[in-house]
Regions:
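Extracellular receptor-binding modules and their adjoining Ser/Thr/Gly/Asp/Asn-rich linkers
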Residues: 1-114
């Protein structure tokens, strides 16, 4: 006889905000915390599609720029125009959607990292 034990919420990959510049392990962009009342600390991650991406305060982007991790939870412009395993996505417009207290900001992007 076998016993099947279901582990709650064990289907999700564990993740963290990227702390490695140019990381090939980035698989999405933080969207929001799941604030339900369970005991699990879940977050929503946006992958393929369109979403805003947070850009480092010292980085200026243009529409068409490819983005990679800056290693501090924000993105920077990729060194070339070739979509790579480290590419997060492409900037759709440089119009800032939100600016944070640390002067980082978000812009709309097409995401490639899902």
């Amino acid at each position: 006889d076998a016993v099947l034990v279901k582990e709650n919420d064990n289907k999700h990959t564990k993740c963290k905000i990227s702390d490695t510049a140019d990381s090939k392990r980035v698989y999405g962009v933080f969207a929001d915390w799941d604030n339900d009342d369970d005991t699990v600390n879940d977050m929503y991650v946006t992958a393929v599609g369109t979403h805003v991406v947070r850009i480092n305060k010292d980085v200026t982007v243009q529409a068409g720029d490819l983005l990679v991790s800056n290693g501090d939870g924000t993105a920077k412009v990729q060194d070339d125009d070739i979509i790579r395993s480290k590419t997060i996505g492409k900037v759709l417009t440089n119009i800032k959607q939100e600016t944070y207290s640390d002067k980082s900001y978000t812009v709309p992007c097409a995401l490639y990292c899902g």
